[in-house]
Amino acid sequence: RREILAGLADGSIDLCIGTHALLTEDVQYARLGLVITDEQHRFGVGQRAALSKKAASPHMLVLSATPIPRTLALIIYGDLDVSVIDELPPGRQRVDTFAVNESYRQRLNGFIRRQVAQGHQVFIVCPLIAEDDQLPDERKAVAAYADKLRREVFPDLRIAVLHGRMKAREKEAVMAAFAAGESDILVSTTVVEVGVDVPNANLMVVENAERFGLSQLHQLRGRVGRGSAKSWCILLSDSENEDTRRRLRVLTETNDGFKISEEDLKLRGPGDFFGQRQHGLPTLKAADLSCDMRLLDEAQTAACALLAQDPTLADPAHGALRRRIDRLFAVNEGGLN
């Protein structure tokens, strides 16, 4: 680490790939010119503020496979140009999604077996790693459920297990074996949500789907349909809760991540949508972010025009606005991040 820090500081390192560690205080850059942030939804505005202190004005490219509503994009990324890739790569097919309850279990098991017999592989995602006696419900746990599948349901199939408590080397070995076709079924937690590319896997089964958010389910669905074969996502839930049924119904009706994110916004609101990772969003008393798209567009245009005329809001006529912004974002030393 010491050598890398020295190389970044003196400019002898041209390209550095890393995690949030690149934003810590002890990391200094000689001439930071370009920052590419992958999985941007996993970074908060705090990280963006930290990055702004590393260089005067580096070029920035942020990428995210988890769409956010365009209404919120205008607020969170108002200083960036937003480009959308909303088409499937050539050769890929739409993933068909079904929400079913436990009464479909036997049919589902038969469907899993047929897919494996045809040479494909299957993801099964559970909400828990291990069973907890303090949680006397019917939530599936990875370890116990995989054992049950091996003993009672698919004793002749190759079943692997993957979860976050495994050592990094173990996880890498399991994923490499699955990608190489050495296992038929991977029973996992949401650790497979991002960064997994197995084109031969064409079936995603999500147990206790009511335990997951819409965006998370959409990400999990994205683990299949990465090859040319027809793919499916099965959402299992016995919940009778109307909000849950509505959420799952959205996924069965569309594969459009932006429509899904808009629905997520309606269901959870902007605060819960981003959680503590994205602070600074005002509590709105009248506006509705899911409906007031035109008004937000006009507000952004007006804000850009104002900042072009008075970038620091130094004009006395803009004093009240400046003070309001300072209070809203708790700005220190009069600087905007």
Summary of predicted features, one role per range:
Residues W232, E240-N337:
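C-terminal accessory region of SF2 helicases/translocases
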Residues R1-R249, Q309-T312, N337:
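Inter-lobe coupling/hinge segments of SF2-like helicase ATPases
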